Swiss-Prot record:
This is Porphobilinogen deaminase. Its EC number is 2.5.1.61. Keywords: Porphyrin biosynthesis, Transferase. InterPro entries: HemC, Porphobilin_deaminase_cofac_BS, Porphobilin_deaminase_N, Porphobilinogen_deaminase_C, Porphobilinogen_deaminase_C_sf. It comes from Ralstonia nicotianae (strain ATCC BAA-1114 / GMI1000) (Ralstonia solanacearum). Coiled coil: none annotated. Belongs to the HMBS family. The modification S-(dipyrrolylmethanemethyl)cysteine is found at C258. Pathway: Porphyrin-containing compound metabolism; protoporphyrin-IX biosynthesis; coproporphyrinogen-III from 5-aminolevulinate: step 2/4. GO terms for cellular component: cytoplasm. Monomer.
Length: 334
């Protein structure tokens, strides 16, 4: 079984003995704690007699604020300490923003549930400008990801893109004190914290394709905790899970990490198909490549296959050459 797939052979939550006590591991940022509280409320809805508590933790990713994630180790910096708590039995489950979860989990861990997705798009935030098109030449835009940076450089070469680190409140304060003309954030985080009024415009996927898993919450547990997996089953949202499984399959096969300007976004169509789009670019935005495909996956394996198909299209189109220039662990050319 893939370390990124939800187990399929767990007890029915109706058959499993209801939990009496659960501990949720979470980062301590305001957004992370909101997400943990959201999961706690959902669990208490299904298990009202259960004592659900939150173990707040500071991760290495929270401590390193003077360098971009691409330079200090990437996504794993936000989950390692939480996984240690799971391994040691100090927590039963960990709540993550799925886009921050590495494409390959360490042995012994599994994504046991994926919740229904919030808005997956990027958000344009500015005190002075209505949208990206309104920014003048030389305007400084802050972003925390190479993916957004590459997308912006490809479509708005007249803008100056600068790194932006810190939690959500810190990033907004940097904008408010005038460090940036605008910043790009995930729309989901702003909406979850009741900050929708800060969004001047949501950015269409055609302009900035979202990251794999963006807007979705993933709940991680130990692979041997079948009881936890059963208790989490009512929280699992299958349509979201199939979409993000396809996205993560693309990213995993192309070596996706914070060091790679890679986007992957799957969206259900009105006809019931899953449309998967992917985009990779050099950091300066000059070399870029896109691919897409549709399928009607009913299982995680079929969603993985859709992701593999799009990843192969990318490789056939020259993604290997772009990835190689980044020093990424690019798959061999075929």
């Amino acid at each position: 079984m893939s370390s990124n797939a939800r187990p399929t052979s767990v007890e029915s939550p109706l058959a499993a003995q209801a939990p009496t006590k659960l501990v949720i591991a979470s980062r301590e940022s305001r957004l992370a704690m909101w997400q943990a509280e959201y999961v706690r409320a959902a669990l208490q809805k299904y298990y009202p007699a259960c004592d659900v508590s939150i173990l707040g933790m500071t991760t290495r990713g929270d401590q390193i604020l003077d360098r971009s994630l691409a330079k200090v180790g990437g996504k794993g910096l936000f989950v390692k300490e939480l996984e240690v708590a799971l391994a040691e039995g100090r927590a039963d489950l960990a709540v993550h923003s799925l886009k921050d979860v590495p494409m390959e989990l360490p042995p012994g861990f599994v994504l046991s549930a994926i919740l229904e997705r919030e808005d997956p798009r990027d958000a344009f935030v500015s005190n002075d400008y209505a949208d990206l098109a309104a920014l003048p030449a030389g305007a400084v835009v802050g972003t925390s990801s190479l993916r957004r940076e590459a997308s912006l450089r490809a479509r708005f070469p007249h803008l100056v893109i600068q790194p932006l680190r810190g939690n959500l409140d810190t990033r907004l304060s940097k904008l408010d004190r005038g460090d940036y003309a605008a910043i790009i954030l995930a729309a989901a985080g702003l909406k979850r914290l009741g900050l929708s009024e800060r969004i001047r415009a949501v950015i269409a996927p055609e302009t900035s394709l979202p990251a794999a898993g963006q807007g979705a919450l993933g709940i991680e547990s130990r692979v041997d905790r079948h009881d936890v997996q059963a208790w989490l089953a009512p929280l699992h949202h299958a349509p979201t899970a199939l979409a993000v499984t396809a996205e993560r399959a693309v990213s995993r096969q192309l070596g996706g990490s914070c060091q790679v300007p890679l986007a992957a976004f799957a969206q259900w169509t009105d006809a019931g198909a899953l449309r998967l789009r992917a985009f990779v670019a050099s950091p300066d935005g000059r070399r870029k490549l896109a691919a897409e495909a549709e399928a009607t996956p009913a299982t995680p394996a079929e969603a993985e296959a859709l992701g593999a198909r799009v990843a192969q299209q990318m490789l056939d189109g020259g993604a290997h050459d772009i990835l190689a220039t980044l020093g990424a662990d690019a798959p061999p050319a075929t």
